């Protein structure tokens, strides 16, 4: 990628006059639709729903617990189409270039997320489809163009989940060295500023920043969604919160208690409003285990833990605990089993009534959505459809 280290010398910096001589037509230079109308992430459901991790091996569980889940195109497509039929708002993939070792090599078998999103955009009708992108691995010009293309394929349903690349062994595969935590967010801010211009500028422009350099930059067409595609970020550190409040539409948070959820969501939403005059949604993730009885649900959850890949979990905890990510600090110290059963997220275990009650509590604490993992996505979506969705409607958090 062309960064500021690759700036051409003054003698080589000659403009070749390739900019269009006539104004570009409206279908190239402007958004085609209001994203409030095309992207379900902006609908009026009180508690939005989504699936997390249906593109990579073992989903959200580091475990050999029995499941029909597999990483094949037909399987992931079937899951996406069923969630779409059920009225879920979003599919958010995990971006992974290297597994976490252990006996499962957790998440090591993984579909690349932009092409995954493009395929599912064509295969679905209503649900928002995200790509999760490690910003250090993608130039903004390439990523913005891919995002625009998927937005056109989907009719304005695309979302881009921006991640800074906290897994050091993974980032080192690309030949560079890992930046310090706050420097990753400084890079991310310049990256997204560049992308914003690519999605909005109707003519060519120059970029001359700390991390990126470009001359006569242009990008056509623009996304379907105006003013830009939906953006997601999962940063929960001070730098991550600042980045989210300033730039994105959904903050994706890993939290441990309802009290912390309430404090976190109110603080972030107030920061976005008071400092940047923006509205932001907060959503969480975690493993949902629902069975007919509480005992059955707890037994299924415990089986995930008992069959856990503690080697992979230990590797994740080691990387997160090294300071590579500050978003998991509280989880690393106190809730190691949550990595085995839910990737460090908020677990909900119980009967349909208990699951619904917990979702209501999360919503009352300020969460606008739950992006869930399931032990067996394809099979357990039917439990959610038949037993939980009706109760959520009765509770007033879905309609």
For each predicted feature, which ranges?
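An alpha-helical appendage that flanks or caps ligand/catalytic pockets
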Residues: 10-55, 81-85, 174, 181-227, ...
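Hydrophobic faces of well-ordered beta-strands that scaffold small-molecule active sites
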Residues: 47-51, 91-93, 129-133, 158-162, ...
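Conserved, mostly hydrophobic/aromatic
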Residues: 49, 83, 87, 120, ...
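Active-site mouth loops of central-metabolism enzymes
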Residues: 59-74, 132-141, 177, 225-238, ...
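Catalytic domains of carbohydrate-active enzymes, especially glycoside hydrolases
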Residues: 71-96, 243-251, 361-367
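Glycine-rich, proline-tolerant flexible connector loops at the mouths of alpha/beta enzymes
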Residues: 90-114, 255-258, 372-385
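Alpha-helix-loop-beta-strand connector modules within alpha/beta enzyme cores
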Residues: 104-130, 187-191, 274, 384-399
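Hydrophobic or amphipathic alpha-helical targeting/insertion segments
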Residues: 141-143, 148-166
């Amino acid at each position: 990628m062309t960064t500021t280290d690759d700036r051409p010398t003054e003698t080589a910096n000659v403009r070749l006059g390739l900019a269009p001589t006539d104004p570009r037509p409206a279908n190239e230079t402007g958004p085609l639709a209001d994203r409030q109308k095309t992207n379900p992430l902006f609908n009026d459901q009180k508690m939005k729903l989504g699936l997390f991790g249906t593109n990579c091996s073992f989903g959200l569980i580091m475990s050999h617990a029995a499941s029909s889940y597999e990483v094949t195109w037909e399987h992931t497509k079937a899951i996406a189409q069923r969630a779409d039929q059920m009225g879920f708002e979003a599919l958010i993939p995990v971006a992974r270039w290297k597994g976490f070792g252990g006996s499962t090599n957790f998440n090591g078998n993984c579909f690349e997320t932009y092409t995954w999103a493009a395929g599912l955009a064509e295969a679905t009708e209503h649900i928002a489809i995200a790509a999760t992108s490690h910003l250090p691995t993608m130039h903004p010009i390439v990523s913005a163009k891919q995002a625009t293309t998927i937005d056109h394929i989907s009719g304005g349903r695309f979302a881009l989940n921006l991640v800074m690349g906290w897994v050091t062994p993974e980032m080192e595969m690309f030949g560079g060295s890992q930046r310090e935590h706050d420097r990753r967010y400084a890079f991310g801010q310049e990256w997204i500023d560049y992308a914003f211009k690519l999605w909005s500028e109707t003519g060519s422009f120059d970029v001359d920043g700390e991390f990126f350099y470009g001359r006569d930059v242009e990008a056509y067409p623009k996304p379907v969604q105006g003013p830009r595609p939906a953006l997601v970020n999962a940063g929960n550190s001070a730098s991550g919160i600042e980045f989210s409040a300033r730039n994105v539409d959904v903050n994706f948070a890993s939290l441990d208690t309802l009290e912390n959820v309430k404090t976190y969501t109110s603080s972030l939403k107030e920061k976005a409003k008071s400092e940047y005059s923006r509205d932001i949604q907060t959503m969480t993730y975690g493993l949902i285990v629902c069975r007919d009885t509480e005992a059955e649900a707890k037994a299924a959850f415990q089986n995930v833990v008992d069959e856990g890949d503690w080697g992979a979990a230990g590797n994740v905890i080691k990387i997160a605990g090294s300071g590579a990510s500050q978003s998991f600090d509280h989880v690393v110290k106190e809730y190691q089993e949550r990595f085995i059963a839910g990737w460090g997220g908020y677990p909900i275990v119980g009967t349909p009534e208990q699951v619904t009650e917990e979702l209501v509590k999360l919503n009352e604490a300020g969460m606008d959505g739950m992006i869930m993992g399931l032990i067996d996505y394809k099979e357990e979506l039917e439990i959610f459809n038949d037993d939980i969705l009706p109760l959520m409607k009765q509770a007033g958090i879905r309609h």
